[in-house]
Amino acid sequence: MRNRIEQALQQMPASFAPYLRELVLAKDFDATFSAEQYQQLLTLSGLEDADLRVALLPIAAAYSYAPISEFYVGAIVRGISGRLYLGANMEFTGAQLGQTVHAEQCAISHAWMKGEKGVADITINFSPCGHCRQFMNELTTASSLKIQLPKRAAKTLQEYLPESFGPADLGIDSGLMSPVNHGKTSDDDEELIQQALRAMNISHSPYTQNFSGVALKMRSGAIYLGAYAENAAFNPSLPPLQVALAQAMMMGESFEDIEAAALVESATGKISHLADTQATLEVINPDIPLSYLSL
């Protein structure tokens, strides 16, 4: 990953490459740009907003983990706060393809896990597939979300997904990224369980009521959280493990460094993530211990 990031930086225009390099290679870089940092990049580059976001896509794509397709896709989400979040696609050799995370899903979940309550626009290398269009239609900002592709004018999500099916069709009026706290608690004092419980309490699961969260502990001691992102069309739903793995990937972590995992989910939900979580972790490393709590 580091080599790909270096290569991407070398492609950047000289007008803003030094400043961008300083940001991206900083030890505390978290694959986001503040509104102020992005404004400085705009000033230095002299580019229009859309053109700069497209120019930055190679940085996002450099985070991709795609051992199956070797097809590296980047995405950049702008939250309603003005901060920009990078994302990339993620694949798992040995796991069924349904465990794949698309770049759009990665960038959106990245923003969500860092506290964003909505997405203003998303910039991607290639036209979003139907799966991702449906995933984005779950968002709080689905009606106004704009999609920017290289060498094209921006379009709204609804132009890419006309006559769309979404939460409202199932009687749900709160979208993905809505502020929520399910208020679940546990007396279990295991740190990773408590962290997974934090993720569970912000999860989006209006259709199955399987509120769920995952926490991953790395060898470095860092902990990454993932909340379940359910979708009205069911199949585009993003499991909590994948959300947590995306957070780790966007911080430059290696999946080989996962030391332990925890899954907390509702005991009364209509589905369970336990079997799929176990299976995916088994593919990554069969020795990763998984703590489990059903509430």
Swiss-Prot record:
This is Cytidine deaminase. Binds 1 zinc ion. Its EC number is 3.5.4.5. It catalyses: cytidine + H2O + H(+) = uridine + NH4(+); 2'-deoxycytidine + H2O + H(+) = 2'-deoxyuridine + NH4(+). Substrate binds at residues 89-91. Belongs to the cytidine and deoxycytidylate deaminase family. Pfam families: dCMP_cyt_deam_1, dCMP_cyt_deam_2. Residues 48-168, 187-295 form the CMP/dCMP-type deaminase domain. This enzyme scavenges exogenous and endogenous cytidine and 2'-deoxycytidine for UMP synthesis. GO terms for biological process: cytidine deamination. One of its GO terms (molecular function) is zinc ion binding. The gene is cdd. Homodimer. InterPro entries: APOBEC/CMP_deaminase_Zn-bd, CMP_dCMP_dom, Cyd/dCyd_deaminase_Zn-bd, Cyt/Deoxycyt_deaminase, Cyt_deam_dimer, Cytidine_deaminase-like, Cytidine_deaminase_bacteria.
